[in-house]
Amino acid sequence: MSQLSFSSFDTSLMVRDAQGRYLLATADQILEAARQAIEHKMRRGASFSSPATVKEYLRAKLAGFEHEVFAVLFLDTRHRLIEYAEMFRGTIDSASVYPRELVKEALRLNAAAVIVSHNHPSGNPEPSAADRALTQRLREALALVDVRTLDHVIVAGSSTTSFAERGLI
């Protein structure tokens, strides 16, 4: 396999415009293409069988936002995707999350498990004390209706932090 230099890699990322001409792809076009590819791969019913798959999917979904977004993967008993939902939006450094709304949606979808996630636009993937407290509140609320909280993933640009991998959940 031949190696590509950065400059040759740049020129290989092309898009076709409305007139059929090939132009260099912008960063936004590349990110959108990556999101679409991952979305296509993880359609409803796809199984989240590894933490790497979960993190790749959530990174593609949440990395580009300039404000906090709290999202949930609702899963069935075999950890297959029922629905991805961006449930709450906030400011550049916080988002209000309401456990009651998350429980209602889990029940509506008949979810057996969830993976919660949010982004840190600051670029720092470390969980705050508020993130840890929220995770515990959500786990307790969801447990009352027999819905398991499998993980809480923080996305910060290309970095992610998994509560499950750190033993925090």
What positions do the PLM features span?
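Active-site-proximal loop/helix of nucleotide/amide-processing enzymes and allied scaffolds
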Residues: 2-32, 36, 53-56, 78, ...
